[in-house]
Amino acid sequence: MKRFFLLPLLLGAAACSSPQPETTTPAAPPAPPVVPGPDLTTLTDSNAAPLLRAYGQQYPAREVLLQTRHGNMRIRLYDDTPIHTANFLLLSRKGVFDETVFNRVVKGFAIQGGTSDHRSIRIREYRLPPEIRPQHFHKRGAVGMARYDSKVNPGKLSSNNDFYIVQGQQLTPAQAQAAAGRKLTPEQLQTYATLGGTPSLDGEYTVFGEVVEGLDVIDKIAAEPVGTDKWPKKDVDIKVKVLQ
């Protein structure tokens, strides 16, 4: 046992006999920049919509860059989904998405992100009123917001942070219309045939943007090996930067 204490004792003796260097108090780290916008811990189902509308009008932007180890996706956000767009911008600027991963990946369907087991930023679980527009459909690259199913959520209120990006599959016009919950336009049917998508989600979830660059990144993430819960076995981290 003595050998284990010998070196620390010698070091202690040397420290006592050596002059002590002058010590200085380390400077405090700079405070993080203050990001304008509503306090994420105070948003609720009842006040989120008006506060987010006001935020979007005061701090508008229409494009973000979503960065992953598989590459980047440039996403254009829609003007006519102002609540969802403002919410996505707010959480992006506050750094919420930078602490998240793609947590549910279903190849041939969609990749879902916005969740993390290690989030340090406090955020309340408020929901968003639906902004479902017939002109925004679930083509490949569509960006929508997840929600609980209609049995417990008949108002189709969206999650505040769980978003998804459509991969989908190419479908004939007949297949697309049969899968869709509403009447599709000829242009939408043609898009499902050439670009692909998941028409079964149309009319059920709010689509508030689309990938305009980096569609191939969707396929790379969708090809990740996943566990039984569809969570990729190797985390696909997310970083989101507001562009304009």
Language-model features: where?
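Sec-dependent bacterial lipoprotein signal peptides
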Residues: 1-14
